[in-house]
Amino acid sequence: MALQTGEPRTLAEKIWDDHIVVSGGGCAPDLIYIDLHLVHEVTSPQAFDGLRLAGRRVRRPELTLATEDHNVPTVDIDQPIADPVSRTQVETLRRNCAEFGIRLHSMGDIEQGIVHVVGPQLGLTQPGMTIVCGDSHTSTHGAFGALAMGIGTSEVEHVLATQTLPLRPFKTMAVNVDGRLPDGVSAKDIILALIAKIGTGGGQGHVIEYRGSAIESLSMEGRMTICNMSIEAGARAGMVAPDETTYAFLRGRPHAPTGAQWDTALVYWQRLRTDVGAVFDTEVYLDAASLSPFVTWGTNPGQGVPLAAAVPDPQLMTDDAERQAAEKALAYMDLRPGTAMRDIAVDAVFVGSCTNGRIEDLRVVAEVLRGRKVADGVRMLIVPGSMRVRAQAEAEGLGEIFTDAGAQWRQAGCSMCLGMNPDQLASGERCAATSNRNFEGRQGAGGRTHLVSPAVAAATAVRGTLSSPADLN
């Protein structure tokens, strides 16, 4: 990334330059000011302990927001948390936030939910910001034209104490997606196809800017889905330049600017675009019209194929490391090469997570489930990304559609995205999930995960095998 030189700059470079407190001059890290710090119960306890031991306070508590998400149950939330480790982490977060004066949205609060859903819904996430959280999927917030990234626990402490972070400039990547998306193809299919194309290390060391007519046509929810999974491509962050879609989403939200402050903010936001002539370190191109519903078959997000394809044969792979990884993945997933993806039966379907737990995602699922039933032998969990999302879904009658279909309509939380709460797979169970990671044991020890879009998840629940809504007609 380039410092201010008068040369054309990318969006990421502009935001970076606007937040340099002290320049490292290319020899040392730059000290970057942080506009918004998001906190949850898993990665923050040691950071607060560090502050306490050093006798420090939180530098800017008003720029810090905490919520309970990873460990919380999604049923019986009025009861004590059963797991002692989860209970301790949640209780510790509550004590730390009370002691250090940090806003916290706890279970039962209408604004409680997954931190990467809560920030945008409150209007805290805004264009041009630097945003960090002790969570890799902080890249979600880049959908608003923010530079947002996950950080480690020691960095969480540094931001709490100073509201700054020492960082070395990143490389920049442009992912250009042009053309019209076919019917039934979503943002989730775009990002899964991209990761399959460039690999889980393809974006390493980069900030990705998603560009092109297909990206511009997406809703904010769709853009958040894509930016959310930038980390699965190895990138440090992902972002989309703000536009009228962004401004319309933010207008009127609780923490969005109003009146003259809105007008001032809008002037700045409208400048947040990559300059003509700016040079990216890497450029990637996808043809939107060529995309189709996508699904993973292996144990990393890059091991995916179109739903219409079959499980690949490792023996046809020319790269030794790729072949060995595929063989190991197929053994864990209990799949045979050549099996049609549509013939793979599932035991469970999970709709939710910071990737696909927003109201637009739930509307897509409801449209597929309306008048249909979840297949016998399939357990379907639908978990809203926040209590605010749940309330909106209830107001629109979506909850009734879910329960009428035989799905479990839960309270807000990270849920079955990861095995840190009661919502887990049993060993050997197979799940179609709208979440972001399909690692071994991610959804519970021995569980097998296929990453899919909300539409594919809903159709899969109805048919009992990996399917798209078109397969139901």
Curated annotation (Swiss-Prot):
Keywords: 4Fe-4S, Amino-acid biosynthesis, Branched-chain amino acid biosynthesis, Iron, Iron-sulfur, Leucine biosynthesis, Lyase, Metal-binding. It catalyses: (2R,3S)-3-isopropylmalate = (2S)-2-isopropylmalate. Its cofactor is [4Fe-4S] cluster. Its EC number is 4.2.1.33. The keyword Zinc does not apply. The keyword Ion transport does not apply. GO terms for biological process: L-leucine biosynthetic process. GO terms for molecular function: 3-isopropylmalate dehydratase activity; 4 iron, 4 sulfur cluster binding; metal ion binding. It holds the Pfam family Aconitase. [4Fe-4S] cluster binds at residues 354, 414, 417. Binds 1 [4Fe-4S] cluster per subunit. It is an enzyme of class 4 (lyase). Catalyzes the isomerization between 2-isopropylmalate and 3-isopropylmalate, via the formation of 2-isopropylmaleate. Heterodimer of LeuC and LeuD. This is 3-isopropylmalate dehydratase large subunit. The gene is leuC.
